[in-house]
Amino acid sequence: HTGIWTTVLALASLTTTQGAIDYSEPRPFGEATEFAKDCDNLAIGEWWTVDAKTVGARSGGATEHGDWFKTVDRSKALAFALYTHDHSVLKISGQCFPLKPDEPKSVTLEFKQNGSWVKVQEQPVLYPGWSIHFRIEDWDNSVDVPYRLRLGELSSFEGLIRKDPKDKDTIVVASLNCNSPREEEFDTRKQIVANLRQHDPDLLFFAGDQNYTHDESTFGWLQFGVQFADIMKDRPTICIPDDHDIGHGNLWGEGGKASLGTKGAADGGYMYPASFVNMVERQQTWNLPDPYDATPVKQGIGV
């Protein structure tokens, strides 16, 4: 299987360069509306100083468990990853907990070759949202390949890129949705994950409402990801955001128009700013196969 390693070596020095990212920006979604000024507070600016009890009534379990970010073992700062591969394109998203000023802000993707880790790409941690994204073309989907994401020397996360199960008579898909935080298992789903492992699905499909923390979306997304990291790390995963993922009680999308936020946004569109919606979509869906038509809808919201 030399093809995959030819690709790896060709990409070994590839790094996406972007303009300087201000990881301490206190208003990354702007100040045009109250929704823009009051979202993702537990994961932006000087997040380590925020009193979780002040983040608002719409944040569900984030208020009750809001100090979670402050107590995370920093060796686990790189929390989880999810991927798909389709038509010879591998797409991987990694997710960090909010990072402190003196911690690394880029992540390296490595594949294991002949027992050794080989660097493929290095990409910046994006802000807001603290996600990282890798795209590998000419992917050989006929072999299993171990992968590792490394946040400098601080933290790492390992998994397996599974080969395409085209030799199987039956493809097993695990479908889950509506991951309520209102229970004792705050950051685990031990029984569910154990049962999933018994079925060993070829594909995971999370059909929406991965969290219910509304305006504290990064908090809820990390809660979800930590809960399911052990099953997502070694098989393709599809996540599709629904209403609660972007802070709504119902999803009124309406081509991406802006909502005034009254009566549950029943006037149509999105209550939260497009930059917030795009952050959620980036966190949850960047790893999906490329869309047939990538033209954004109104406000520049992605598809």
Residue locations for each model-derived region?
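Metal-dependent phosphoester/phosphodiester hydrolase catalytic core
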Residues: 21-303
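Boundary at the C-terminal end of the N-terminal hydrophobic targeting segment
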Residues: 17-19
